[in-house]
Amino acid sequence: MYPAKPTVATASEPVTGMAAPPVTGIPISSPGPAVAASQWSSGLCACFDDCGLCCMTCWCPCVTFGRIAEVVDRGATSCAAAGAIYTLLACFTGFQCHWIYSCTYRSKMRAQLGLPDVGCCDCCVHFCCEPCALCQQYRELRARGLDPALGWDVNAQKAANNNAGAGMTMYPPTAQGMGR
């Protein structure tokens, strides 16, 4: 009635009579390599490390923000468009809500570069000290070999000319969606 010896499959002997279930669904690509955590290259209150940047950010924060946004968005948003949105938000809300827009780019940048919080959330940093936060982000991009003043296209071209980014930090490709 029962077999004398139970049948056990080993790694060299596949189990017969059992078919693997069919694979269905949408193929999912594996996520890219995890970004290693690193530290900010300068402090939040190190604005005077670059007096030119400090002055530009105090008098025209829309320019500083626009440059940062273009690089963080990898050219998907132009400096002019991001700066204009920042300025319109500042003007139409009485300089009360523009920091909400800029804090989203700080979060994107931290995620791309593996940077830690500076003790509080990104929105709190931008709400309490918008110019210092923008200066820190700008300095960080520069410290990683990206010059926001040049724009994304020139930075990407420089990376391509340096043997696919040797000595220069390149971001992983962006997730693309459908568009016109």
UniProtKB/Swiss-Prot annotation:
Tissues where this protein is expressed: Expressed in roots, leaves, immature ears and silks. Detected preferentially in silks.
Assigned keywords, A-Z: Membrane, Transmembrane, Transmembrane helix
A Gene Ontology cellular-component term: membrane
InterPro entries associated with the record: PLAC_motif_containing
Origin: domain of life: Eukaryota
Residue stretches spanning the membrane: 80-102
Pfam families noted in UniProt: PLAC8
Location in the cell: Membrane
Membrane topology annotation: Single-pass membrane protein
Similarity-based family: Belongs to the cornifelin family.
Name the UniProt record assigns to this protein: Cell number regulator 7
